[in-house]
């Protein structure tokens, strides 16, 4: 049994305020046509292979690097609260495996407070992922997300 302190020690978190309404940010996260535009660090191309957006549904995306190398990201959605929360398992082979992603959305007027948690299986693995560039990698992904959703409302 794990307590919240143990989970805190296994969790890396990014938070930002996105200058777009929560409904638009939510749509960007939940619709395959949108996901392909922003998922992945800058310079990568994403192809949505599968996106069964419901609790128990699977998702699978490929990310192609500029040199042509491909990475697969995939998981299973475990919890979806419309306009508030998405929880999914995630594998980013070969770099990251066995993690849980928690995307939290909170309306703040016409802006969205977006919180992203990645829960790792162990504290050691969490530290290793942080040292491998977690903040820069996911920061780049969410820069793409922010640029994309703000372009939708212009």
Task: Give residue ranges: language-model regions.
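A conserved amphipathic terminal alpha-helix motif
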Residues: 120-154
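Ser/Thr-centric signal marking residues that sit
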Residues: 30, 112-115
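Hydrophobic pocket/interface hotspot
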Residues: 25, 35, 59-61, 77, ...
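Intrinsic-disorder/low-complexity, polar/charged segments enriched in Ser/Thr/Lys/Arg/Asp/Glu/Gln
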Residues: 9-15, 22, 46, 58, ...
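A structural signal for short, well-ordered beta-strand segments
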Residues: 14-16, 103, 116-118, 138
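Hydrophobic ligand-binding cavity/cleft-lining segments
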Residues: 1-45
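Hydrophobic-ligand binding "helix-grip"
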Residues: 36, 42, 50, 64-109, ...
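A solvent-exposed, acidic/Ser-Thr-rich amphipathic alpha-helical stretch
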Residues: 32, 41-56, 61
């Amino acid at each position: 049994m794990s307590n919240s302190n143990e989970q805190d020690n296994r969790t890396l978190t990014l938070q930002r305020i996105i200058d777009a309404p929560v409904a638009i940010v939510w749509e960007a996260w939940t619709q395959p046509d949108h996901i392909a535009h922003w998922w992945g660090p800058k310079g990568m191309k994403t192809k949505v292979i599968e996106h069964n957006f419901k609790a128990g549904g699977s998702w699978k995306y490929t990310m192609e690097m500029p040199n042509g190398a491909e990475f697969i990201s995939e998981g299973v959605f475990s919890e979806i609260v419309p306009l508030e929360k998405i929880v999914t398992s995630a594998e980013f082979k070969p770099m990251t495996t066995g993690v849980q992603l928690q995307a939290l959305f909170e309306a703040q007027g016409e802006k969205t407070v977006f919180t992203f948690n990645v829960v790792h299986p162990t504290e050691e693995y969490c530290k290793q992922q942080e040292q491998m560039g977690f903040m820069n990698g996911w920061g780049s992904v969410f820069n793409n997300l922010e640029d994309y959703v703000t372009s939708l409302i212009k």
